């Protein structure tokens, strides 16, 4: 590599196949140029992250496979977004994949950048056997309370499916009033590919709704905080009052 410039080496690395990473890491490490040695360190970190992701993907179907082993055939993962905000809806999603589906990067939506969530949103919809999204607005949240509203959103999501699952993996909850076997999994959105995918669909859908509200009520900053109780949001409420999308039951102390 001594005969190549740093720029040329960077261009090679950008198109390098993963199988050749170790070979190039060793070559770059012995280069006398500090900048090239720095590229070796970056490439080694990238390889380490790839290996960690491969290891994670090997375990992310465990709960789905347990369901198949029990004889279930159509397994869905379900999760919600928006239980905590002061404004806007709560959104739930359910996703059904074929057995042993693996999608690189699918994880708890809170651990992903917005750009990555948006990218995976499209991939998940393409890869899923089926998916459903349920939305419950702020007025229903005030009427039924947030927990019941969350269950309502989940049931709406299930009802959007072409075919009901015979087994549901749920993120740390059991949905009442449905005749489907369920497995509540603590931190399921980082342990099950189906729940993780559902968390991404729910989050991206809700964020999209809040972006629309931001155009209607630009002074509240919904685009940035998505309705959560930030300092900016509370200051806007104090200055302008509440909007029709605010959850009054969440604002009893200041109304």
UniProtKB/Swiss-Prot annotation:
What Gene3D superfamilies does UniProt report for this protein, alphabetically?
Ribonuclease H-like superfamily/Ribonuclease H
Q: So what EC number does this one have?
A: 3.1.26.4
Name the coenzymes or cofactors required: Mn(2+); Mg(2+)
Q: Where does it primarily localize? A: cytoplasm
Tell me the cofactor note. Manganese or magnesium. Binds 1 divalent metal ion per monomer in the absence of substrate. May bind a second metal ion after substrate binding.
GO cellular-component term (any): cytoplasm
Task: Outline the extent of the RNase H type-2 domain.
Answer: 73-255
Write down what this protein is called.
Ribonuclease HII
Tell me the organism. Answer: Clostridioides difficile (strain 630)
Query: Which gene produces this protein?
Result: rnhB
């Amino acid at each position: 590599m001594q005969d190549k410039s740093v720029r040329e080496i960077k261009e090679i690395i950008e198109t390098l196949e993963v199988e050749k990473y170790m070979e190039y890491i060793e070559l770059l490490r012995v280069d006398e140029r500090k900048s090239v040695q720095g590229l070796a360190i970056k490439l080694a970190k990238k390889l380490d992250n790839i290996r960690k992701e491969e290891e994670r993907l090997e375990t992310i179907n465990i709960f789905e496979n347990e369901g198949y082993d029990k004889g279930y055939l159509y397994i869905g993962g379900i999760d919600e977004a928006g239980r905590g905000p002061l404004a806007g809806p709560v959104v739930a999603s359910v996703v059904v994949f074929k057995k042993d589906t693996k999608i690189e990067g699918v994880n708890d939506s809170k651990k992903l950048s917005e750009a990555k969530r948006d990218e995976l949103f499209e991939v998940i919809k393409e890869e899923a056997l089926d998916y459903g999204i349920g939305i419950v607005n702020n007025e229903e949240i005030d009427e039924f309370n947030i927990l019941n509203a969350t269950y309502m959103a989940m049931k709406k999501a299930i009802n959007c499916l072409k075919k009901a699952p015979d087994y549901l993996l749920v993120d740390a909850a059991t949905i009442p009033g449905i005749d489907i076997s369920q497995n509540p999994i603590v931190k399921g959105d980082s342990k099950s590919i189906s729940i993780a995918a559902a968390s991404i669909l729910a989050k991206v859908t809700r964020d999209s709704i809040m972006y629309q509200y931001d155009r209607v009520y630009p002074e509240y900053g919904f685009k940035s905080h998505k309705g959560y109780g930030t300092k900016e949001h509370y200051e806007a409420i104090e200055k302008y009052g509440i909007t029709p999308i605010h959850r009054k039951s969440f604002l009893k102390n200041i109304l």
